[in-house]
A protein has these predicted regions:
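Structured beta-strand/loop patches that form or line metal/cofactor-binding pockets in enzymes
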Residues: 3-28, 32
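Glycine-centered tight turns that cap/initiate beta-strands
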Residues: 57, 84, 99, 176-179
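Short, Asp-centered acidic motifs that coordinate Mg2+ and/or phosphate
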Residues: 62, 102, 182
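Rossmann-fold dehydrogenase core element
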Residues: 141-158, 177-185
Length: 207
């Protein structure tokens, strides 16, 4: 999604399976469109949904949430039909909905494994927000479930699609950097609400 993630998740995903062509007024793009249901309607899910409004290769068509009031708000804001709205108890029924191609899981880290596996078992492609899982074992179980169901699995990460990252890769491949002896990467963010799930080890894992 260009405004927040360079629309990266749609690029390797869409050609493989999307069945609907774009017909947005004023858009020159007439290729396949990925029809996405977002699971998890929190702050980041909202940012994704807002950014998707300008996407050409993906469209928000459904929601999955445990908060009925949020579902109603999103229905009104994004024009989502009732038949494409689910909660965490009944979203397995999404397998019978031909209008949804994929589910973007944007929930606390500790919930990813179980939710992605259920998405796969429902026959829908899965986009999972980073980090994919709490550990490698969980991640492998998710991969295995998607392979078994013959659906795609993509982690919602964007840096390998960014211009600066691609340039560094090019420089390395063309030996412009010489012999690399040391690399250090640093990243930080404000903790914010001390009661948030990101500070809960069971939900966030390593954070």
């Amino acid at each position: 999604i260009k405004k927040i993630t360079t629309s990266a998740f749609t690029l390797p995903f869409v050609p493989a399976f999307a069945r609907v062509s774009a017909n947005q007024p004023g858009s020159s793009y007439q290729g396949p469109v990925l029809r996405v249901a977002i699971m998890g309607l929190g702050s980041y899910g909202t940012r994704v949904a807002d950014a998707m409004q300008s996407c050409k290769m993906a469209k928000l068509v459904g929601v999955i949430s445990g908060t009925p009031s949020k579902v109603k708000d999103w229905q009104s804001k994004y024009n989502i039909p009732e038949k494409n709205c689910y909660n965490y108890e009944n979203f397995d029924a999404i397998k019978n909905n031909p209008d949804i191609d994929a589910v973007y899981v944007i929930t606390p880290n500790g919930l990813h494994k179980g939710q992605v596996i259920r998405v796969a078992q429902a026959g829908k492609h899965a986009i999972c927000e980073k980090p994919m899982a709490l550990d490698a074992k969980e991640g492998q179980e998710m991969v295995d479930a998607c392979k078994k169901a013959k659906v795609k699995l993509l982690v919602g990460y964007r840096m390998h699609f960014e211009v600066k990252t691609l340039e560094i890769i090019r420089m390395r491949k063309e030996n412009e950097l010489g012999k690399i002896l040391f690399f250090q990467g640093l990243c930080g963010f404000r903790i914010g609400d001390p009661t948030q799930w990101r500070l809960n080890y069971k939900l966030a894992g390593g954070g």
